[in-house]
Amino acid sequence: PSVFVYGGSIMPGEHPDGRKLDIVSVFEAVGAHAVGDIDDDELLSIERAACPTIGSCAGMFTANTMAAVGEAIGMSLPGSASAAAIDTRRSDIAFASGHAVMNLLRLGILPRQIMSRGAFENAIAVVMALGGSTNAVLHLMAMAFEADLELELEDFNRVAARVPHLADTKPHGKYHMVDIDR
């Protein structure tokens, strides 16, 4: 039996002018600095403010995408993917996950019984709706292989054709994983 417990994402930083910052802000600032659009002080200001807490990258990159997959596929508790790493609910999530895994043990339920073909399709739908990382394709195909299920690239295309992209999340959008939690 198994329950996946995600550690949570970092909180976005804040520039002195009020702009939300994250690791992508640093990448963009390094580029802007290289071409002379911002000075050393501005670059340093962004670097110091962009990553203020512990946790995975704030946007819909691989870690947050796969945390959402964990919920969608049934291997994590509902609501556990979007709480930030510093959120006080993290302890409650871990404790409840411990109870859940003990219940799965008592019932004899194994991951392969949870991660059905339908669960994988649900996970793909969540990835598409969130605009998740393309790495989810590789990870989900590897997980399906371990679960002794067939999953093809065409399955992703088929699900993507019927599921709209709903979340305006970084790196392609405006919001961070903690905003999904709100």
Where are these regions (language model features)?
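Catalytic cofactor-binding cores of redox enzymes
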Residues: 121-132, 145-147
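Terminal amphipathic helices with adjacent charged low-complexity linkers/tails
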Residues: 5-12, 71-99, 136-182
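Catalytic-loop motifs flanking and including active-site residues across diverse enzymes
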Residues: 61-65, 133-139
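Active-site cavity-forming subdomains of large catalytic enzyme subunits
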Residues: 1-122, 127
